[in-house]
């Protein structure tokens, strides 16, 4: 089954789920689907960012992560841990750069960092880095943050 066919099946059931973004890839094809709208879209080669909106929504944290990744790629071939470090930033965006998403601006600023922790009720749970080599090898590392246990668990997969 092709990625596009798979996502078309998911699209038919999109109302069964809370909001989500899903990336699906095979060989040199990467597709994204969001049940927020927009349908199945092909992702062109390049640097992209994804948060709790559509792919490449120009939120400060998305733009900052894309810029940081571009800098990292200019200087070396990043390792998974380098990529995960980019996503652990707790730096908050200035209020004047924040989008108006309908929540209070103080909360908007609190959640404007790459890594979010708002007391015990909201925040980053999983951070995932993926490297897809020119030779076709794929490596994925995901870190799960469990604040109540004050621990991080990580999973690594490669093929």
Where are these regions (language model features)?
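N-terminal nucleophile
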Residues: 1-159
């Amino acid at each position: 089954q092709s990625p596009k066919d798979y996502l078309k099946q998911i699209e038919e059931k999109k109302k069964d789920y809370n909001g989500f973004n899903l990336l699906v890839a095979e060989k040199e094809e990467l597709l994204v689907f969001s049940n927020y709208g927009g349908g199945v879209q092909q992702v062109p080669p390049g640097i992209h960012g994804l948060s709790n909106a559509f792919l490449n929504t120009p939120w400060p944290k998305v733009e900052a992560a894309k810029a940081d990744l571009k800098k990292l790629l200019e200087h070396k071939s990043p390792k998974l841990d380098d990529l995960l470090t980019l996503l652990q930033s707790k730096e908050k965006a200035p209020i004047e750069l924040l989008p108006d998403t309908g929540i209070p601006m103080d909360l908007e600023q609190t959640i404007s960092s790459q890594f979010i922790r708002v007391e015990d009720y909201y925040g980053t749970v999983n951070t995932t880095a993926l490297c897809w080599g020119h030779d076709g090898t794929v490596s994925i590392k995901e870190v799960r943050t469990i604040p109540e246990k004050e621990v991080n668990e990580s999973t690594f997969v490669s093929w």
